[in-house]
Amino acid sequence: MSHEEDLIDYSDEELQTTDAAAAAATAAAAANGAAVKKGDLTVSGARADKKGSYVGVHSTGFRDFLLKPELLRAITDCGFEHPSEVQQVCIPTAILKVDVLCQAKSGLGKTAVFVLTTLNQLEPVPGECSILVMCHTRELAYQIKNEYARFSKYLPDVKTAVFYGGTPMQKDIEVLSSKDTYPNIVVGTPGRLNALVREKKLSLRNIKAFVLDECDKMLDQIDMRRDVQEIFRSTPADKQVMMFSATLSQEIRPICKKFMRNPLEVYVDDDTKLTLHGLQQYYIKLSEAEKNRKLNELLDNLEFNQVIIFVKSTLRANELDKLLRECNFPSIAVHSGVSQEERIKRYKEFKEFNKRICVATDVFGRGIDIERINLAINYDMPADADSYLHRVGRAGRFGTKGLSISFVSSEDDMKTLKDIEKRFEVALPEYPEEGVDASTYMA
């Protein structure tokens, strides 16, 4: 089945957007530092005549965004002083309720764009859901829910709930059965949300904002895309749609825009520049049999706060985790073979710094934001260049320093390495025998 099959189409009447909204989008982007100069940030405003106009970013504070005072207090409590590049460009336009399609590499604060925007717009009504956020993994849903919790700490009337598969649906139904617990903001995975909508437990008739995080992953998989479409059809036509990802191929962009009306398109760094600034990247050529010894050596010799080690299967994750613990390394394993409650428990344990080493499959490869990770090791090479970007993006979040090391043990691994170098126009050096200076990757 092609990407274009079974896609949402609005009627012509629904697709009409006022010139005022289009002008507001372009004006907001312009007011936020628009300049005809080359840079790494490309903005296509609503109905922009020329795609690829460049925007230079001025130093801005969160106060310039005209956010609610309660949000500004929470932002200050979190220790944020200045918005990131993507936040400076997206937030002023998004709070005007214009649709947004945004690609920005890992760690640049995309989540805060939609969390702050939707909280700023929200006027909570008891028993009414106004904001719907969907993502493709349970861990990411849990993390987004926590972001809403910390930014809404001074908005006591705002209720947020997270719903995902792998847990008893009855618990979700109980939350949705009482006006006292019914959420104003729902975060979840498409399968569980679709089930709740079908059972008429979750009403989407009052949705004002519809958000997809890591949207390419969700719209690329046919089953997940169908769930997204079914949920989308249950929401009002007159709503804001925002989609975000670190990778948005030329093929997936038109699919995303099928859900939108005249969106502001923001691409922070073009496709070839998506590798991460501040992240030192190396590879080590070795045999499969040498991997465990080399991993032990790296963990003994490298300085790191926390490390995430990626493997290709749940079986290998369990075996490697067991081996590390036998060698007295403080390790945990997170993968799809672990029960949902246990996965969340282990995720919290790692995030709260109770464990320093996490062995994971690609379930941890996208969107998970743990600020202390500054070392990512590909024990097994990823399947493709996009997966590589999402994996190594766990280290060096929000522009900080980090280190990634990939084990290359076969011809297929070397081919993937060459694909990564070609795709991102980088040359990954071999890891030096003498190691690397900790000051190059430790913040």
Curated annotation (Swiss-Prot):
UniProt-annotated location(s): Nucleus
All copies of domain Helicase ATP-binding, residue ranges: 91-266
Record has Cell membrane as a keyword: no
Domain of life where this protein originates: Eukaryota
GO molecular function term, any single one: RNA helicase activity
Family: Belongs to the DEAD box helicase family. DECD subfamily.
Domain notes: The Q motif is unique to and characteristic of the DEAD box family of RNA helicases and controls ATP binding and hydrolysis.
Designated name of the protein: ATP-dependent RNA helicase SUB2
Organism: Coccidioides immitis (strain RS) (Valley fever fungus)
Species classification: Eukaryota, Fungi, Dikarya, Ascomycota, Pezizomycotina
UniProt gene name: SUB2
